[in-house]
Structure formats: C-alpha cells, structure tokens
C-alpha cells in the first residue's frame, strides 16, 4: 500500500481563495475590509518570519493588515494597553499576539486581555469553554485546519476510532474536542500513556502533535489509517550540510507504506494554519458587523 498524500498546501490555497472572494463581498456590504492586527514583541527570527508571512497572506486575501512590532523589553502594562486599544478599534476584527513572548511577560494574562470576539487564534479561555460545551466561538487554527483536511478526505467521521497524541491547549485538547463533536470515538494519548503503540494501532485516525521527530513508527499504525502529522522538527544536519531536514512526528517514508492517507511535513498541516486564521478573521468581521455568513461558505 502506498498512502495518498494529503496536500494541505493545495487545500489551503483553495481556502484562501474562497476567503478572499468573501472578503470582497464583505467590503461591498460593510464599507470596509476585514482587519487583522498582529502584535510581535521582541526580535525572535522565527516569529518575525511568521508575522511577515501572515501579513502577506492577509493582504492577498483582500483584508487589512495591522502590524505592531514592540521591543523585547516592553512592559506588560504597555502591551495590555495596546491590546485594549485594539479591542476597541472597529477596524480590527481579529487580534493575534505572536507567541512565544519574552520571559518577563505572562502569556496567559495577555491572551486573557484579548476580546473573545476578536480572539481569532482561539486561545482565550472563554473560546476554549465555548468549544467544550458546543457553543459558537473561535477554534484554534491548527486543529480546525486538521479537521478540514479530515472531512475532505473521509467525509463523515461518525464511529471512527481516533487517537490524538499530545494534549496541549493549542492542538491536542481542541483537536480531541473537534473529533468528539464529529462523533468519532476519541482517545488522547500523551507521555504517560501506557502501551502507546497498542493504543495507536487501533485508530482509524491518528493525529500526532507532540514535537518529537519521527516518533510514530509504521508498526504502530493500523493498515489503512489516516494520519495527520502536526509536528515540525528539524533533524541534525548531515555531514557537509548547514541545516538538517524538516520532519514531522511520524516516520513519513515508512508510514506511507501502511497508512491509506498521510500529511507530509512540510506542506501538510502547516499551510492550513494561516489559511484558517484568515477564515476566522473573516468570520469575526461578519459577526462584528452583524452580517450573515453561511456556515458552509468556508
């Protein structure tokens, strides 16, 4: 068996195209474009790349991009004041504070200061609570992107066995909740799970989100499983090379001989995250203006 490659890059491109078309319609109805504000504190090179990419994608989707770059020694008081200002700005529909923050800033208190209605990252405890009880809110971008890929590949997930490896608030826990809401039978596995290979072996759907390079081996997988690899890890460089390869949490090459479908790294889940961020911003804009947006439109 050779697995079908789930092309997240192509799916994300189609999603961004739909979001852009709907953003144009929103502008015609509201007299303004949807707006996304991204706040970067410090000069972390990886974060700077992420923010730059988000800005480009926002503009390409017919949205306004507001970028705020603050020095690494920014005080909590100053950062909270900026968040408060953005909460009250009618041109801003979504607010994203790029993580990680410098050590002297408490991430949870900063996220808690963002209006839940503008929390397009879905990290606010109110949005986490809304997800857990089935109320309308914002879902973290990466797990929602994973669900879109699964729905596109499998359709109805009812009754399927799903194992989520990882229990973070950003991916693992919301991913499990989304699968449960889709009527899958869900197990959350983690570092203390006993007999992890046996647990994974019974799953029709495996979502790996632990940040350990190629941890999930092919012998762990059920024949015909669908594998979503959220991990992104850089291996040590090979002799003569400056940088090592990027790999996921799954041994992709050998797992592809067992799974029915699998996401690659890179090019699988990663591109979906920014596309879903734009989708969430579009949804926030419609809600903020009281304009209907059909749920199946995006």
From Swiss-Prot:
EC number: 1.5.1.5, 3.5.4.9
Family matches, as Pfam families: THF_DHG_CYH (PF00763), THF_DHG_CYH_C (PF02882)
Catalytic reaction annotation: (6R)-5,10-methylene-5,6,7,8-tetrahydrofolate + NADP(+) = (6R)-5,10-methenyltetrahydrofolate + NADPH; (6R)-5,10-methenyltetrahydrofolate + H2O = (6R)-10-formyltetrahydrofolate + H(+)
Pathway the protein contributes to: One-carbon metabolism; tetrahydrofolate interconversion
SUPFAM superfamilies: Aminoacid dehydrogenase-like, N-terminal domain, NAD(P)-binding Rossmann-fold domains
Sample GO molecular function, one term: methenyltetrahydrofolate cyclohydrolase activity
Record's keyword terms, sorted: Amino-acid biosynthesis, Histidine biosynthesis, Hydrolase, Methionine biosynthesis, Multifunctional enzyme, NADP, One-carbon metabolism, Oxidoreductase, Purine biosynthesis
Subunit structure: Homodimer.
Native organism taxonomy: Bacteria, Pseudomonadati, Pseudomonadota, Alphaproteobacteria, Sphingomonadales
Gene3D superfamilies in the record: Leucine Dehydrogenase, chain A, domain 1 (3.40.50.10860), NAD(P)-binding Rossmann-like Domain (3.40.50.720)
InterPro entries (alphabetical): Aminoacid_DH-like_N_sf, NAD(P)-bd_dom_sf, THF_DH/CycHdrlase, THF_DH/CycHdrlase_cat_dom, THF_DH/CycHdrlase_CS, THF_DH/CycHdrlase_NAD-bd_dom
Organism: Erythrobacter litoralis (strain HTCC2594)
Protein name listed in UniProt: Bifunctional protein FolD
Gene Ontology biological process terms in this record: L-histidine biosynthetic process; methionine biosynthetic process; purine nucleotide biosynthetic process; tetrahydrofolate interconversion
Cellular component GO terms, alphabetical: cytosol
């Amino acid at each position: 068996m050779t697995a079908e490659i789930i092309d997240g890059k192509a799916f994300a491109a189609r999603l961004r195209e739909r979001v852009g078309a709907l953003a144009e319609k929103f502008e015609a109805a509201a007299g303004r474009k949807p707006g996304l504000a991204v706040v970067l504190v410090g000069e972390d090179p990886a974060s700077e790349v992420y923010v730059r990419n988000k800005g480009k994608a926002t503009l390409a989707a017919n949205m306004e991009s507001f970028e705020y770059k603050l020095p690494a020694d920014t005080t909590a008081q100053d950062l909270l004041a900026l968040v408060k200002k953005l909460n009250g700005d009618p041109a801003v529909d979504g607010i994203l504070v790029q993580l990680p923050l410098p050590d002297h800033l408490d991430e949870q208190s900063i996220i808690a200061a963002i209006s839940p209605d503008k929390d397009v990252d879905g990290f606010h405890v109110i949005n986490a609570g809304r997800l857990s009880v089935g109320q309308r809110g914002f879902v973290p971008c990466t797990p929602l992107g994973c669900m879109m890929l699964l729905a596109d590949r499998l359709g109805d997930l009812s009754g399927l066995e799903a194992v989520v490896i990882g229990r973070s608030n950003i991916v693992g826990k919301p991913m499990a909740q989304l699968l449960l809401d889709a009527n899958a039978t869900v197990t959350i596995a983690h570092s203390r799970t006993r007999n992890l290979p046996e647990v994974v072996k019974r799953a029709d759907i495996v979502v790996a989100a632990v940040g350990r390079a190629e941890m999930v081996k092919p012998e762990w997988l059920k024949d015909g499983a669908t594998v979503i690899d959220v991990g992104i890890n850089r291996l040590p460089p090979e002799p003569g090379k400056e940088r090592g390869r990027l790999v996921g949490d799954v041994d992709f090459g050998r797992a592809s001989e067992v799974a029915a479908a699998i996401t690659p790294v890179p090019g699988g889940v990663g591109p979906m995250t920014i596309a879903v961020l734009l989708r969430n911003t579009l949804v926030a804009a419609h809600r903020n203006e009281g304009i209907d947006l059909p749920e199946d439109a995006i």
